């Protein structure tokens, strides 16, 4: 098989949703169909003691939530599938947003009882901005939920995207009978306890059975007043195919997977900072780091840089250019993943996600190229923290572990580090409270370093050019600090303090992001 044929087999997508919509459950079922797990485990691990395959971090297993992005790969129906299971909790949106830069499509999981929720809307806006295809799975049909037509209407009104149902539910909750597959003209009957029946000549059964009268009326209405199916509109991100089903009972999931792989796009190109698009079928290797994760194997205190291959082929031992530093690096110890388990790989192609063992060489957003290519891909999104805490080691004898832990966890990008200019105290910045809790848990569990954390409340952060800096600018209304790149930054008590500073120093330029 040629390199181009291998690349065209790749399907790389993220699964997005509001917390508890069933995202991790559907991921489990997809892995089951891909032959990677023998059975899809019950995801509600915090009560049952069984854990999701994709939730590998200890705190994820304890709480039954996803707080990091997992990467999983399997072969199915002649395709190489790369799934990125993203954290649904809003505190981890920075990690999620970066992950969405590394995929070619998104699967949006919606709870049939709740419809479009806040986090789903936020994540959809990022996906929409990238113009990548969105496939919608409306979940939990085995429970009572909202009317299917209402859900489609909400999709279009709240998210502003046209929808096209690929199947249609017959009943819901206790009266759930199955799904009519509009795309394949097939009837799938639901019998509970993961027992199903599939009837190929669904049209004939529909026509002769009065039980399906309401469903027939809904379908006729959709055919008359609904949107037309267009594969191009799907690829352009203007039309979302909608699938109904129940991830927990594994009903409708395989039909979704089969149809998704039929219409999901091949790997696409990525823009450079100069506006050029790098073709995935180009011969030369290129890629970018979209995530760094410490302690995927706590026994070895390792760090993995996750790289999306944009073009060409990776071969073990190859040399690459790290554009940010202008230096070279050798990709010798490279892995691919099934959540926390991994295996060494000798080659991978555009569309694949690889993990490069990192000793501190890489940063999130780094571009890797070969030969004379020295371009950089467009920067990944960054977020300014709003909540702050002072942090110190509880035991002075554990300073080495404390500093090691802070260094590694900050480099992941899930939390940000600042150092008080005057006192040298460490301060952590986060988007949400859960990030602090996860930081504390991981410091104690992975680095054996207990920490003391003191809330500082909300702050307004602004960076300042070092040439403009005068330490006398620091006052009771602000804290002068350095970020982890030694750039000076002010943490203002509130917007009033920021305006006061701007009035007093009108010639000093303050930046929201560096």
From Swiss-Prot:
Residue sites binding GTP per the record: 17-24, 85-89, 139-142
Pfam family of the protein (one): GTP_EFTU
Protein's UniProt keywords contain Methyltransferase: no
GO cellular component: cytosol
BP term (GO), one: regulation of translational termination
The family this protein is said to belong to: Belongs to the TRAFAC class translation factor GTPase superfamily. Classic translation factor GTPase family. PrfC subfamily.
Residue stretches making up the tr-type G domain: 8-268
Native source species: Streptococcus agalactiae serotype V (strain ATCC BAA-611 / 2603 V/R)
An example molecular function term from Gene Ontology annotations: GTPase activity
Localization of this protein: Cytoplasm
Function of the protein: Increases the formation of ribosomal termination complexes and stimulates activities of RF-1 and RF-2. It binds guanine nucleotides and has strong preference for UGA stop codons. It may interact directly with the ribosome. The stimulation of RF-1 and RF-2 is significantly reduced by GTP and GDP, but not by GMP.
Protein name: Peptide chain release factor 3
Lineage of origin: Bacteria, Bacillati, Bacillota, Bacilli, Lactobacillales
CDD domains the record matches: RF3 (cd04169), RF3_III (cd16259)
Keywords, comma-separated and alphabetical: Cytoplasm, GTP-binding, Nucleotide-binding, Protein biosynthesis
Record's keyword annotation contains RNA-binding: no
Primary localization: cytoplasm
Superkingdom of the organism of origin: Bacteria
């Amino acid at each position: 098989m040629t390199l181009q044929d291998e690349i065209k087999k790749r399907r790389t997508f993220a699964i997005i949703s509001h917390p508890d919509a069933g995202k991790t459950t559907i991921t489990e079922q997809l892995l089951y169909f891909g032959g990677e797990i023998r059975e899809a485990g019950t995801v509600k691990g915090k009560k049952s003691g069984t854990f999701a395959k994709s939730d590998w971090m200890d705190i994820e297993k304890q709480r039954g939530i996803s707080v990091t992005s997992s990467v999983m790969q399997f072969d199915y129906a002649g395709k190489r599938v790369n799934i990125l299971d993203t954290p649904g909790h809003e505190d981890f949106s920075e990690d999620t947003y970066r992950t969405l830069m590394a995929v070619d499509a998104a699967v949006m999981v919606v709870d049939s009882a709740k419809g479009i929720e806040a986090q789903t809307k936020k994540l959809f806006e990022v996906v929409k901005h990238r113009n990548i295809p969105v496939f919608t799975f409306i979940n939990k049909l085995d429970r009572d939920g909202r009317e299917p037509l209402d859900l489609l209407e909400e999709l279009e009104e709240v998210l502003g995207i046209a929808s096209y149902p690929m199947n249609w539910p017959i009943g819901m909750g206790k009266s759930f009978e199955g799904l009519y597959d509009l795309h394949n003209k097939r009837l799938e009957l639901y019998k509970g306890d993961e027992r199903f029946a599939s009837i190929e000549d669904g049209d004939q059964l529909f026509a002769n059975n009065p039980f399906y009268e309401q469903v027939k009326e809904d379908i006729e209405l959709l055919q008359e007043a609904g949107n037309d199916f267009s594969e191009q509109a799907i690829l352009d991100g203007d039309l979302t195919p909608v699938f109904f089903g129940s991830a927990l009972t594994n009903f409708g999931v395989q039909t979704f997977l089969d149809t998704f792989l039929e219409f999901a796009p091949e790997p696409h190109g990525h823009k450079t900072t100069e506006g050029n698009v790098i073709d995935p079928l180009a011969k030369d290797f290129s890629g970018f780091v979209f995530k760094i994760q410490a302690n995927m194997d706590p026994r070895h205190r390792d760090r993995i840089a996750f790289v999306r291959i944009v073009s060409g082929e990776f071969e073990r031992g190859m040399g690459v250019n790290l554009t940010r530093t202008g230096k070279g690096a050798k990709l010798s110890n490279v892995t691919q993943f099934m959540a926390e388990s991994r295996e060494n790989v000798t080659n991978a192609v555009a569309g694949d996600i690889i993990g490069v063992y990192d000793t501190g060489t890489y940063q999130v957003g780094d571009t890797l190229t070969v030969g004379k290519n020295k371009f950089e891909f467009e920067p990944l999104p960054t977020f300014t923290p709003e909540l702050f805490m002072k942090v110190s080691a509880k035991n002075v004898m554990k300073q080495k572990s404390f500093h090691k832990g802070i260094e590694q966890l900050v480099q992941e990008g899930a939390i940000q580090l600042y150092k008080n200019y005057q006192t040298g105290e460490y301060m952590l910045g986060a988007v949400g409270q859960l990030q602090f809790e996860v930081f504390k848990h991981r410091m104690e569990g992975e680095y054996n370093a207990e920490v003391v954390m003191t809330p500082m409340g909300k702050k307004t952060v602004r960076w300042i050019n070092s040439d403009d800096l005068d330490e006398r600018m620091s006052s009771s209304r602000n804290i002068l600090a350095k970020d982890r790149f030694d750039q000076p930054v002010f943490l203002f008590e509130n917007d009033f303090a920021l305006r006061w500073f701007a009035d007093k120093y009108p010639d000093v330029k303050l930046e929201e992001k560096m």
